[in-house]
Amino acid sequence: MNKILVDSSVWIGFFKGQEEAKQLFQLIDSNMICTNDLIMTELIPSLIHKNEIELVNILTSIEKVTIEIDWNGITQMQIQNLKNGLNRVGVPDLIIAQNAIQNKLALYSFDKHFELMKKGFGLTMFIGR
């Protein structure tokens, strides 16, 4: 199985102890996950602000994949989303989706718009238990 890119929505659920995010423990232990700079940028500032240094250390120890933004591809994804009635997908989430596709990673997210995007773009979603 390919690695899994874990979106900030799952990490936030994990940090809050949400039941649906608890399988992340197993994925961390089996070295199945990765992150990128965008996801880290979404998470790290609030963790440092809350003095959650141990969580910051966990996050920074996880493999990071490089983001290579194809802006034309991002524009095309957004156009296709609008045609499909998805008009609330922000640029950061488009970049995360593109990053997962480029690196052949499954994306683990609680954000429903990723599930709606997967068909048209070849995005693979990690389906938890």
Task: Please place each PLM-identified region on the residue numbering.
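Acidic, PIN/NYN-like endoribonuclease modules and their adjacent C-terminal/linker elements
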Residues: 1-3, 97, 101-129
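Short, well-structured N-terminal submotif of metal-dependent ribonuclease cores
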Residues: 1-35, 45-57
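A generic structural signal for short hydrophobic patches within well-formed alpha-helices
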Residues: 11-12, 40-43, 114-115
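Structured helix-beta-strand junction loops
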Residues: 30-31, 58-62, 84, 103, ...
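Active-site-proximal, substrate-binding regions of enzyme catalytic domains
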Residues: 38, 47-69, 73-76
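Active-site neighborhoods of divalent-metal-dependent phosphate/nucleic-acid chemistry enzymes
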Residues: 65-106, 110
